[in-house]
Swiss-Prot record:
Region of interest (Required for cytoplasmic targeting), residue spans: 2-77
Gene3D superfamilies noted in UniProt: Phosphorylase Kinase, domain 1 (3.30.200.20), Transferase(Phosphotransferase) domain 1 (1.10.510.10)
Binding site for ATP: 61-69, 84
SMART domains for this protein: S_TKc
Intervals of motif TXY: 219-221
Organism of provenance: Homo sapiens (Human)
Region span, May not be required for kinase activity: 407-806
Stated regulation of activity: Activated by tyrosine and threonine phosphorylation. Activated in response to hyperosmolarity, hydrogen peroxide, and epidermal growth factor (EGF).
Span list, region Necessary for oligomerization: 140-406
Domain-level remarks: The second proline-rich region may interact with actin targeting the kinase to a specific location in the cell.
Protein name: Mitogen-activated protein kinase 7
Residue numbers bearing the Phosphothreonine modification: 733
Lineage of producing organism: Eukaryota, Metazoa, Chordata, Craniata, Vertebrata
């Protein structure tokens, strides 16, 4: 029997008493919902920006349920920024508290990979008329969602650098005891220099330290379904930083394949997609599920085994898949942390413990646990705005320095300052004559000498009292003259420059630090190359001592290879050895002005498609006399390579690896610069220009190839020693949607979708971040699990998930 519907709890924990379910026609409820959403759209799409004369609005970047964001230019400096407007910020308690939370968090954080507040505009209207909040933020051209689902090249180096910046910002955030809870590609802002910043902290929460805080943690929880951690879907009551690491794993997989990893159409479908890859949860996880019906549903499913990540992403980097597997685990305690992920070998290229700071002190969420009214939230937001400006003015006062010379007040009666002359008529002069001798004592006549009397001590002139460190008037005058001269010269050189004012420190980004580290590393490598070169020179001289003394013919003379390049060269050398004797060879045809030999079919054709080879262009036929060694059968690998007998015409055929189809139909990644690229699966065998393909009859024909110049290949491989290690900048970034600035989901897209909230199959699947996000709006459960609205509401209560926006808080909305 269906349970009665209940009104959703607000932020203050109040709830209406439960009542019976009122059966109403579907079209009536749909029309009322459409009117309510249209009203919300009219409220949110207020794009009139009142920013005064300080900023000039350029264009609108995006708008959503919570606000509008536009690009702007500061008139004084010309700096481009993003201004986020939150209209009617105090009409809905949930939205007002979200604004207060985001302002406090962004004021607390100072990190290169977290969006920063540059300014908060003060209200220009009286307090009673204050309704809209304007926040000035960093301007980022695009977001990661737009980059992934566009034609912009996304190499493995891009993926590595984006993941490093994301984990670096996440480590800082988690050290402040803050959980983002809504990480997704559209909330990660990106610019053309591949810099990444985490945005939209409206859903952030603190760590749960007691079971009583679980309900607080799940309040208005609406994380995008495709990136939602299993503990939130299964109500495991274990809410830690591992929630964000699951989202990072989903984003990581989406960058590797350029499509979503778990694009569930509804709650049930989402669980099915996760279990298709990770397998059935362990019995301990199933027993910890808080919702009884969810536990029964999982137990009713047949057991599944996890699928290897190499099968999900064939041809992907092994270290990348190793890190991905440690992020996506059912058990939250088994997932890798952000700090440990930064130490993974996949990110060793960028990892620097000294450049990955923590946040101190931790952020205090005490304000968020209080039951606040609209008026109290408004007062708190105004207080935050004034506090921001007070802090900024305090910092300006600290760094401001006005040059001024204050006269030194001399202490009255100080002898070391006045320095009176010894010949002064004053009675207190220190240099006066010694006093007269005292009168003789009465006694016998001085004709006798008393040997018992001690001779009087010699009278010396008393030295004038002098204080340590005293200076004369002449010295003081010289010092004053030198100071005045220095001051005049400084003021003459720069009248507006303050005396000894510290120069403003230019902010250093993570990319600049990385370039400095790479420059130091490059210099170390150059020194190592010089040492290796000298060592090779000595070895070459030793080898040539017993020979005829002619010049060395070593093609590797003077070149130093890295370990990776050396392994590639050794592999190529093994493949260039003479062919195995099992292969039959056909003698080359007689010389002719225009020889047109064709390759012969091997005795045992290799399985699978053969990738198109690339490499140096073939030389002319007359440049080679006699047979040339050909590549032998390569070692076992993902795709074997064809071999052929030696012949007089060179045909280079370096090895290539052909990728196979992905479990999720993932697109192949563009290989990073300097590494061999993957070929397109299923291509036909390659035939050099000028050579006809074998005829349809399948007659045996001859194949001629020659090894390319080893010196040329070595020089090409050695280019990796001097190339820029950072990923290439984007030539043109697609325009972002503004979601990363916390404006909420796009209402236009929401209104254009059907009320079943399903995601349409087809080419547009990867273009949307997700369907609607709220658990209370998941009407697709009707179709996915055969539920009626009352069942949906009761299950929502059971798994403790509320709505992102309480439409009942709007006074002028109609009740369905």
């Amino acid at each position: 029997m269906a349970e009665p519907l209940k009104e959703e709890d607000g932020e203050d924990g109040s709830a209406e008493p439960p009542g019976p379910v009122k059966a109403e026609p579907a079209h009536t409820a749909a029309s009322v919902a459409a009117k309510n959403l249209a009203l919300l759209k009219a409220r949110s799409f207020d794009v009139t920006f009142d920013v005064g004369d300080e900023y000039e609005i350029i264009e609108t970047i995006g708008n959503g349920a919570y606000g509008v964001v536009s690009s702007a230019r500061r008139r004084l400096t010309g700096q481009q920024v993003a201004i986020k407007k939150i209209p009617n910020a105090f009409d809905v308690v949930t939205n007002a508290k979200r604004t207060l939370r985001e302002l406090k968090i962004l004021k607390h954080f100072k990190h290169d990979n977290i969006i920063a507040i540059k300014d908060i505009l003060r209200p220009t209207v009286p307090y009673g008329e204050f309704k809209s909040v304007y926040v000035v933020l960093d301007l980022m051209e695009s977001d990661l969602h737009q980059i992934i689902h566009s034609s912009q090249p996304l190499t493995l180096e891009h993926v590595r650098y984006f993941l490093y910046q994301l984990l670096r910002g996440l480590k800082y955030m988690h050290s402040a005891q803050v959980i983002h809870r809504d990480l997704k590609p559209s909330n990660l802002l990106v610019n053309e220099n591949c810099e990444l910043k985490i945005g939209d902290f409206g859903m952030a929460r603190g760590l749960c330290t007691s079971p009583a805080e679980h309900q607080y943690f799940m309040t208005e929880y609406v994380a995008t379904r495709w990136y939602r951690a299993p503990e939130l879907m299964l109500s495991l009551h274990e809410y830690t930083q591992a929630i964000d690491l699951w989202s990072v794993g989903c984003i990581f997989g989406e960058m590797l394949a350029r499509r979503q990893l778990f694009p569930g159409k509804n709650y049930v479908h989402q669980l099915q997609l996760i279990m298709m890859v990770l397998g059935t949860p362990s019995p301990a996880v199933i027993q910890a599920v808080g919702a009884e019906r969810v536990r029964a549903y999982i137990q009713s499913l047949p057991p599944r085994q996890p699928v290897p990540w190499e099968t999900v992403y064939p041809g992907a980097d092994r270290q990348a898949l190793s890190l991905l597997g440690r992020m996506l685990r059912f058990e939250p305690s088994a997932r890798i942390s952000a700090a440990a992920a930064l130490r993974h070998p996949f990110l060793a290229k960028y990892h620097d413990p000294d450049d990955e700071p923590d946040c101190a002190p931790p952020f205090d969420f005490a304000f968020d646990r209080e039951a606040l009214t609209r008026e109290r939230i408004k007062e708190a937001i105004v207080a935050e705005i004034e506090d921001f400006h007070a802090r900024r003015e305090g910092i300006r006062q600290q760094i401001r320095f006005q040059p001024s010379l204050q006269p030194v007040a001399s202490e009255p009666g100080c002898p070391d300052v006045e320095m009176p002359s010894p010949w002064a008529p004053s009675g207190d002069c220190a240099m006066e004559s010694p006093p007269p001798a005292p009168p003789p004592c009465p006694g016998p006549a001085p004709d006798t000498i008393d040997l018992t009397l001690q001779p009087p001590p010699p009278v010396s002139e008393p030295a004038p009292p002098k204080k340590d460190g005293a200076i004369s008037d002449n010295t003081k005058a010289a010092l004053k003259a030198a100071l005045l001269k220095s001051l005049r010269s400084r003021l003459r050189d720069g009248p507006s420059a303050p005396l000894e004012a510290p120069e403003p420190r230019k902010p250093v980004t993570a990319q600049e630090r990385q370039r400095e580290r790479e420059e130091k590393r490059r210099r170390r490598q150059e020194r190592a190359k010089e040492r290796e070169k000298r060592r090779q020179e000595r070895e070459r001289k030793e080898r040539g001592a017993g020979a005829s003394g002619g010049p060395s013919t070593d093609p590797l003379a003077g070149l130093v290879l890295s370990d990776n390049d050396r392994s590639l060269l050794e592999r190529w050398t093994r493949m260039a050895r003479p062919a195995a004797p099992a292969l039959t060879s056909v003698p080359a045809p007689a010389p002719a002005p225009t020889p047109t030999p064709t390759p012969v079919q091997p005795t045992s054709p290799p399985p699978g498609p053969v990738a198109q080879p690339t490499g140096p262009q073939p030389q002319s036929a007359g440049s080679t006399s006699g047979p040339v060694p050909q590549p032998a059968c390569p070692p076992p690998g993902p795709a074997p390579h064809p071999t052929g007998p030696p012949g007089p015409i060179p045909v280079p055929a370096p090895p290539q690896i052909a990728t196979s189809t992905s479990l999720l139909a993932a697109q192949s990644l563009v290989p990073p610069p300097g590494l061999p690229g993957s070929s397109t699966p299923g291509v036909l065998p390659y035939f050099p220009p000028g050579l006809p393909p074998p005829d349809a009859g399948g007659a045996p024909q001859s194949s001629m190839s020659e090894s390319p110049d080893v010196n040329l290949v070595t020089q090409q491989l050695s280019k990796s020693q001097v190339e820029d290690p950072l990923p290439p900048v984007f030539s043109g970034t697609p325009k972002g949607s503004g979601a990363g600035y916390g404006v909420g989901f796009d209402l236009e897209e929401f209104l254009n979708q059907s009320f079943d909230m399903g995601v349409a199959d087809g080419p547009q699947d990867g273009q949307a971040d997700s369907a609607s996000l709220s658990a209370s709006l998941l009407a697709d459960w009707l179709e996915g699990h055969g539920m009626n609205p009352a069942d949906i509401e009761s299950l929502q209560r059971e798994i403790q998930m509320d709505s992102p926006m309480l439409l009942a808080d709007l006074p002028d909305l109609q009740d369905p």
